[in-house]
Regions:
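Short amphipathic helix-loop junctions that connect adjacent transmembrane helices
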Residues: 38-58
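Intracellular juxtamembrane helix-capping segments at the cytosolic ends
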Residues: 127-139
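Conserved MFS/SLC helix-loop-helix module at the cytosolic interface between two early adjacent transmembrane helices
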Residues: 76-94
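C-terminal ends and interior cores of transmembrane alpha-helices
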Residues: 96-110
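Cytosolic juxtamembrane N-terminal segment immediately preceding the first transmembrane helix
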Residues: 2-23
Length: 162
């Protein structure tokens, strides 16, 4: 897959397409770290306080599996985009799947809780490895701006909202 390299420097002296990638990455990281901050607390809260009532050990195990799945699913997500659907579609589908996962998590049914976690992890596995590759494709091979840390700034920017 090739992405059109833009000479448009409308985003802090970088290609205009970086703006979309920057904010997509920022909100994906907000989703991920926000989930990490609340997941164990929600699982261990009592049923009377609208939690799931899991033991700390069970909640910790689920948290570990979720976190591991988020990072592991980047491998098949990268393969899928390289071989079948392309990076743009992988980022798009990944974002939609993450959104649907959060919608499912908002539904007050314990049975859907795990479905929501699986959807968020799967969507992140599609989005995360591909968005980083797309940032590099915004620049020419000899463009000094290619090594900029601007994408990582989007990770830090979401800290302002947490």
């Amino acid at each position: 897959m090739t992405i059109k390299k833009s000479n448009d420097t409308s985003f802090f002296g970088h290609p205009g397409g970086l703006r979309t990638l920057f904010f997509t990455e920022m909100w994906e990281r907000m989703s991920y770290y926000g989930m990490r901050a609340l997941l164990v607390l929600f699982m261990t809260a009592s049923l009377q306080t609208q939690g799931l009532g899991f033991t700390v050990a069970t909640a910790g195990a689920i948290y570990g599996l979720y976190t591991g799945a988020v990072y592991f699913l980047g491998l098949p997500g990268g393969w899928l985009s390289d071989r079948l659907i392309g990076g743009k579609k992988a980022v798009w589908y990944g974002g939609i799947i993450i959104f649907l996962g959060h919608v499912v998590l908002a539904i007050d049914l314990q049975n859907l809780f795990f479905v929501g976690l699986i959807l968020v992890a799967t969507g992140t596995g599609l989005l995360k490895p591909n968005i980083s590759a797309m940032v590099g494709q915004q620049y020419g091979d000899d463009d000094a701006r290619r090594d900029s840390c601007l994408l990582y700034t989007s990770d830090a920017a979401d800290d302002l909202f947490r």
